[in-house]
């Protein structure tokens, strides 16, 4: 009997996390199900009922972390078995399309550079580059000595550029 994504406890969450990268990562529904099952097994090992949480609430709070770690372990296994070309290795290492580092994937490198080129001044370019490198809003504000509100505004601008360019180029 074949599992369905909605039958697995973490299946829908895994599908939601990787919805932007199905095509580029070449993930099938079975891959997503296996990621979700692996994450569920891992969470069962680490679950401790002494803290007063039910298992379902524990999954709601920590499910995304377990899914990401099981995906990384799956990618590492693939990398060990199949290290054909530099491109495939680069694709495996850089495209972990969780919402945080979705912008750093290879597919959107061109979009990011075009959005970066739309920046009107040096401050915008610095904020954009730090954001793409993985810094959080508050860290960017501290580093560049500007207000967090200004950082939020500039990042919203950057994300709107990316959204516009994404729609234009059909990614």
Curated annotation (Swiss-Prot):
It comes from Mycoplasma genitalium (strain ATCC 33530 / DSM 19775 / NCTC 10195 / G37). Gene3D superfamilies: Winged helix-like DNA-binding domain superfamily/Winged helix DNA-binding domain. It holds the Pfam family GerE. It comes from the Bacteria. This is Uncharacterized protein MG428. One of its GO terms (molecular function) is DNA-binding transcription factor activity. NCBIfam families: sigma70-ECF (TIGR02937). GO terms for biological process: DNA-templated transcription initiation.
């Amino acid at each position: 009997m074949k599992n369905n994504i909605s039958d697995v406890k973490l299946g829908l969450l895994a599908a939601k996390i990787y919805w932007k990268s199905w095509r580029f990562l070449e993930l099938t529904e079975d891959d997503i199900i296996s990621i979700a099952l692996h994450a569920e097994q891992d969470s069962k090992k680490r679950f401790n009922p002494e803290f007063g949480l039910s298992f379902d609430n524990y999954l709601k709070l920590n499910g995304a972390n377990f899914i990401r770690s099981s995906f990384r372990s799956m990618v590492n296994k693939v990398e060990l078995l199949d290290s054909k070309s530099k491109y495939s290795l680069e694709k495996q290492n850089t495209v972990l399309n969780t919402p945080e580092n979705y912008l750093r994937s290879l597919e959107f490198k061109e979009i990011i550079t075009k959005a970066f080129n739309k920046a009107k001044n040096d401050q915008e370019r610095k904020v954009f580059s730090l954001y793409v490198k993985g810094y959080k809003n508050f860290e960017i504000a501290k580093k560049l000595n500007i207000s967090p509100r200004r950082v939020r505004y500039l990042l919203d601008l950057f994300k709107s550029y990316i959204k516009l360019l994404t729609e234009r180029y059909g990614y």
